[in-house]
Amino acid sequence: MNAVTVNDDGLVLRLYIQPKASRDSIVGLHGDEVKVAITAPPVDGQANSHLVKFLGKQFRVAKSQVVIEKGELGRHKQIKIINPQQIPPEIAALIN
């Protein structure tokens, strides 16, 4: 499976998360996943909620349109973005 998959109602992203980074950013390809650095620590779901908020801003969608499908408790996650309004250039470059 690719790091970014386009389907009828949006995008599915396979992510590798780096918590406690110095700033929030989409780093780029990391193996067969997209690496995303976030400032939140991996404690009590803070990293997940911060990731959802960050991706919501990047794709210009509501937080309810960012769904963690797999990997709630790990660094490797599968995220679905429903009907993105914009696609960040780092992600657009990975779409086949």
UniProtKB/Swiss-Prot annotation:
InterPro entries: DUF167 (IPR003746), YggU-like_sf (IPR036591). It comes from the Bacteria. One of its GO terms (cellular component) is cytoplasm. It holds the Pfam family DUF167. NCBIfam families: DUF167 family protein, PRK05090.1. Belongs to the UPF0235 family. This is UPF0235 protein YggU. The gene is yggU.
